[in-house]
Amino acid sequence: MNPYILSIMLISLGLGTTLTFASSNWLLAWMGLEINTLAIIPLMANNHHPRAVEAATKYFITQAAAAALLLFSSLINAWQSGQWMIQDMSMPMSALMTIAIAIKLGVAPVHFWLPEVMQGIKLNTGLILATWQKLAPLALLYQISNNLMPELMIALGLMSTIVGGWGGLNQTQIRKIMAYSSIAHLGWIISIMHFMPSLAIINLIMYIIMTTTMFMIFNTLNSTTINALAINWSKFPALSAITMLALLSLGGLPPLSGFLPKWLILQELTNQNLALTATVMALSALLSLYFYLRLSYSLTTTIMPNTYQHMLNWNIKTKITFILPTMMIMTIAMLPISPSIISMF
């Protein structure tokens, strides 16, 4: 892609999200979401491959349907209340708005587009889709968190954690695994949004850090399938060992960073007399942990048979090397500073 066009698309992505963040009006928020959608579609179709074009088409149709539902619900709410303010939402329209935002996020049971779209695009674009594109819809949910239906949020969260874990079990494509991982993590964020929005923000920040780290690692290793991971131990032994810890952190194992948000969410759900919900979500996290362990096993304990012994490639010549160690440290070792993180919110 032409660098000037790429710059325009990236600036538009930032502009759309910023507009949604700063808006207190549903029309401006809707405009920001649409700018986001239109800006990422050329990045998706940049690959000039039928799968990339198919992914961009699926994404456009899904996001257009969600945007129409969001605009319809905000219009009905404005007709009933007489104003377009985001914070003033009546209960029926709040549920309809939640469903529209869930479609944009890829939350179960309206998640079917996300794995297919993720599989058809490059890892760099997949990183944007899995992290940056979640910010604007979640910002809207944060603003209407007091008017959300707790039963609907718990149902969406439970379904997402279960579907995210169950759907990733039989996958061999890393991009699809990361898509189901995204669905599962969004389930945790959605389930706590009504009860403690600040905790949802902490979970979102940790999710973005861990997911960014994993996409950067897979891009460095140039691996898109589980089988491709098996040859990386002989090429990048140090990176492979640290990647295993990052995967386990993504699964929420203590004492790694990913344990912090899950622990706090389970504690808050229990305080809200939702012990059964917390138990089901904790058990569904074991499903996700299985495919993280599967990736770790392929990466660190299997070596593809070959007759030629590769020289150990300890120096990774890549442009993102200076960013990757910082992201890895944050992914693995943020639990000791968790009291400081909690006090910030």
UniProtKB/Swiss-Prot annotation:
Cellular localization per UniProt: Mitochondrion inner membrane
Highest taxon, organism lineage: Eukaryota
Keywords of the record: Electron transport, Membrane, Mitochondrion, Mitochondrion inner membrane, NAD, Respiratory chain, Translocase, Transmembrane, Transmembrane helix, Transport, Ubiquinone
Membrane topology: Multi-pass membrane protein
A cellular component term, taken from the record's GO annotations: mitochondrial inner membrane
Catalyzed reactions: a ubiquinone + NADH + 5 H(+)(in) = a ubiquinol + NAD(+) + 4 H(+)(out)
Top-level EC class as recorded in UniProt: translocase
Ranges that cross the membrane: 3-23, 25-45, 59-79, 95-115, 148-168, 177-196, 201-223, 236-256, 273-293, 322-342
The keyword Electron transport belongs to this UniProt entry's keyword annotation: yes
Molecular functions per Gene Ontology: NADH dehydrogenase (ubiquinone) activity
NAD keyword on record: yes
Pfam short name (any one): Proton_antipo_M
Purpose: Core subunit of the mitochondrial membrane respiratory chain NADH dehydrogenase (Complex I) that is believed to belong to the minimal assembly required for catalysis. Complex I functions in the transfer of electrons from NADH to the respiratory chain. The immediate electron acceptor for the enzyme is believed to be ubiquinone.
Similarity comment: Belongs to the complex I subunit 2 family.
Record-given protein name: NADH-ubiquinone oxidoreductase chain 2
This protein's encoding gene: MT-ND2
